[in-house]
Amino acid sequence: IINDSGRISHFNWRNNSEIIAWGASVNPFNSMRKFSSLNKFIIKPLLPIYKKVIGRNSLQGNSKISSLISGDSYLRIDINSGKNSSFGKDILIQDGHPSICPSNANLILSDTYPNDNAICKFFIYDIKDNYIITEEELNSINSFDNTPLRCDLHPKWSYDGSFVSVDTMNDG
C-alpha cells in the first residue's frame, strides 16, 4: 500500500517511480475510514451536517474547511519511498481524471465534473511552474449529471503529446 489514507482515486503514472492521484494524505481523520464501526456510527451520520457546513460536495471542489479536514488534493506519490506530497492546492480544487503528457511529464491534462450550470472544464496544468496553461469549457447535458448516465470528459493525450481528446455527449 503506497497511501493508506483510505481515499485515493483517479491516478496515473507520471514516470516509473511516481504516481499522481486525487486523494487525501494520511491523517487521523482519514485513518478513521478504515474502521467500519467508526464509519457506520460516526462518519456517515455526520456527513449531511458536514456537507451543509461546507456548502458543497466533492464534485464542486474543496472549500477551505473541507481541504483542512480531509486533505483532499492532487498528490505526487513516490512508490519507492512511499512519500506523498500535494500540489496545486489553491488551483486544482476538484477531483478529475489526470493524464500525463507523453512528451513532457510536467504537463497534466485533467477535467472537472459539471458545476451547477452544467459546465465542465478540461485543462492543462504545469506541475513544475504551478499554473494552468489552458482551460476549456464544455456544456454537459444537465439531465444526465449526477446520474449513472453522465459522461465524464476523461481527457487523454495523443501518443506524441500533440493532441488531446475528451469524451462528450454534446453535439458540437
Question: Residue locations for each model-derived region?
Answer:
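Loop/turn-rich, solvent-exposed surfaces of beta-rich toroidal or solenoidal domains
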Residues: 51-75, 83-131
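Conserved beta-propeller blade repeats
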Residues: 4-29, 91-111, 142-163
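Multi-bladed beta-propeller domains
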Residues: 1-9, 41-49, 78-95, 126-151
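Generic alpha-helix signal with a bias toward terminal, lower-confidence helices
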Residues: 12-14, 120, 134-137, 169
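Beta-propeller domains
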Residues: 1-38, 59-73
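Short glycine/acidic-enriched loop and turn motifs that connect beta-strands
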Residues: 26-29, 113-118, 170-172
